[in-house]
Amino acid sequence: MTPTDRPAMRAFLVGMHDAEANFLAELVRAPSDNPPGDCAAHAEHTAILLERMGLTVERHPVPAELARAHGMASVTNLVLRRRFGDGPVFAMKAHGDVVPPG
């Protein structure tokens, strides 16, 4: 990130504070318990919420046999994009599955 990119990114993040809080409140409403690890619906719900925030979202479903081989019923990876300038790319890795309640 270049010094000229920082103000644009900061302005974006500050301006999105309420949307971020609403996003997180909505996100935790979508079940993603693992087991059973059926996270495709959660990923789609997440993608829709992120698109509403102005991000470009690519959906990459993992083949069912590969998901099952890793103990998951379904997995969809999301790639998000938001351009702030000509600076370097910022990458973040996260997961949406959670342990069952209780």
Identify the residue ranges that each predicted region occupies.
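Acidic/His- and Gly-rich active-site-bordering loop/insert found
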Residues: 2-102
